[in-house]
Amino acid sequence: MKILDADAWMAALMAAPRPGADKILAFYDARVDAVCRDARCLLLPLDDHMCHRGDALFESLCYREGRIFALEEHLARLRDGSRALSLLPPCSWDELRARILDVARASGTDHGDIRVLVGRGPGGFGVSPEECPQSSLYIVALRKALPTEAFYEKGLTAFASAIPPKQEYLARIKSTNYLPNVFMAAEARQRGMDVAVTFDEDGHLGEAAIANVGIVDAEGRLCCPEGRRILPGTSMLAARKIAPQRLPVVERPIRREEIFTAREMLLFTSASLCVGISHFEGRPIGQGPDAGRPGPVARGLRDALLEHMLATGTPF
């Protein structure tokens, strides 16, 4: 086995295959305190507790037409997680916000996704945060194709996951410890469906792997699960804010059997805003001739959310 010096190592590393490089537009690394556009340089120290312990926070943002959606809401949730984990970023919150805008500008495109990751930092392979003298910060701008009209018109298929909801003390922290979510994504692939959805021990609706879900119930109300064992996403919260102009909104436990009598089932994400779920466990959602197709609330909320987020998004 060869033993390389630093120059030879870096040359070999830069020449090695880099899957996913085409998706990375620009990134910031607090260790260097600069932005780079070469995906080969996007590297994480293996002894950062983010890597081997999941001791880190992250946020997924999207930007459209040169505006970052819900930036302040994402930062507020990151601060909440920071308090819960006693994990501060290696800069001030104002500086972190400015770095996000810097990376968005450096992406060279007016639409894409952004990931913000705050880790415990490098320092060892133990579990105690005390061995990490400085936290880490990475901000990455990603290439992201906009959802097509065909995607929205077709809708999504969903099913009840075998994975239980996260425990209450973990559910509201957006950490990088995402193994249950990975299991849910694997379930969906194995079953040939789009979305796995959790249910608690009492049969109440939880969330999808990387999205919130809700229903338009038989009475025509937008119903969202209680926030006790889910992570309320920025798109769902925005939908609850603007939806009362269209229909009543309630937050309450949603029983699994209600899905089969619901008018619509909805999925909320930062990237696609609001998408109708057309089938659950192989059965069409909705009643009458329009059953099994995304309904008017899904379409209306998607348009309203896009309008709201473009109007309130942070320009860069």
PLM features: residue spans?
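Short secondary-structure junction motifs
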Residues: 109-113, 193-194
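Helix-start/capping segments and mature chain N-termini
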Residues: 1-90, 98-102, 128-316
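Phosphate/pyrophosphate-binding loops at sites that engage ATP/ADP/AMP, CoA/4′-phosphopantetheine
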Residues: 104-108
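Short, glycine/charge-rich beta-strand/loop segments that flank catalytic centers
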Residues: 92-101, 111-126
